[in-house]
Structure formats: C-alpha cells, structure tokens
Amino acid sequence: KYFFNKLSEVEGPEGITAGGGYWSARISYLLGNAKEANYFLKKAATKERTFYGSLAMASLGYKYKPNFDLPKYDNNLINKILKHMGGVRALALIEVNEFYKAAREFRKIIPKFDLKDYPQLLSFTSKNNMPGLTFRLAAILRNDHNKILLGGLYPVPSWKIETSDLKDKALLYAIARQESGFNPRARSSSKAMGVLQIIPSTAAFIMKNRE
C-alpha cells in the first residue's frame, strides 16, 4: 500500500499516478478505511482521461462528458494554406480523395504555421479525413503546450467500412490509433503492416490461406 500511495503522488504520466491512486483506494477499502479509500478515488478521478481515472469516476458515481468539439476553421486559414505550393497541392489532392498524399504535403508546411493556427488546422485535417495528421498535431499541443483537444487526440476517420459484421467501430479506431497512429503505410520490424499493424502470416492463418 505504501508504494501505491507514493505512486499516486509522483509527478509523472497521468496513467501511472491514476493507477497508484486507484489501487491505494482499493487496498484502503479492503482494510476497512472507507474515508481514505474515498480520498484516493477522488485523487485518481482527477485524471479522467486515463483508464484508472475512468474507473475511479465510475466508482464514485461521477459522470464524465468529454468534449470532442473542434474549433471551426475559416477562410483566413484556407488563404494561409494557399500561400504555400504544398498547401495548393494538398487541397488539390483532397479534391480527388487522395487524403494520405494530402497529409504528406501538409506535414511539409506545418512548421510554417503559427501555433495559434493549430486548433483550426486540426479541425481542417479532421474534417478532410486525415486522422493521422490530426492525431499528431493534437499530440504536439498536448505534450509541448499542455493544450488538450480531445477531438484531435481521438479523431474519427471517414473510412468506408463494411459494417454488416462489425459490432464496434470504436474498437477498430482505438486499435488503429494505438498501433499505427492511423498511418496506412506503417511497417514494423516484425513485418506488421497498415493501420492495424497486421502480420501477413497472421492474416493468412485467419483467412485459412497459407499459400
């Protein structure tokens, strides 16, 4: 219990401190100290965007309503994009649904934008089916500037998915976010490929085609 208590107090990743608080609460409850358990649950619940923070909030009966709204982008942003040849190419590629190639063009010109433009850029890339770039921009704002835009950190791609047998799109998006950051060209040293980082031999086994 001592180590979980200390873990809840350290300055570090929110997921770690929330886990320390949650397990301190569990142990305190089992030891019959409800007041202390409540204290640590409340402490963990302040990290509502983490797994253990969510568990703590549920244990306390709190309701969490995340805001996934992104700011609207305006014509000023479009004009800034058009000032760069890469931006012109990106807009042209969007017109013909070449979103991955458009995102590659955008990555080259992102450093030319001011930080204050990033929220609108997030909105633009999200609306135009560039989840990987949206996620990366949102991560920069979170990691370097402590600005949280949940709509950017958890983008919803406009993928054409056959939904007849798919029960949970959110799970598919979560795997894509974790495994590849929505990068369709991602490859690992173990030969895993694509947004879901599927290993060809595994795919062949599942499809019963090992030729």
Give the label of every model feature segment.
Residues 12, 48, 77-78:
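Structural signature of alpha-solenoid helical repeat scaffolds
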Residues 1-5, 60-66, 94-100, 148:
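Helix-turn-helix repeat elements of alpha-solenoid scaffolds
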Residues 1-4, 13-16, 24-27, 31-43, ...:
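Catalytic glycan-binding domains that act on GlcNAc-containing polysaccharides
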Residues 49-53, 58-67:
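Long, contiguous interaction/recruitment modules in multidomain scaffold/adaptor proteins
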Residues 71-84:
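TPR-adjacent "capping" and linker segments in tetratricopeptide-repeat scaffold/adaptor proteins
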Residues 85-101, 105-108:
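Alpha-helical segment of the N-proximal tetratricopeptide repeat
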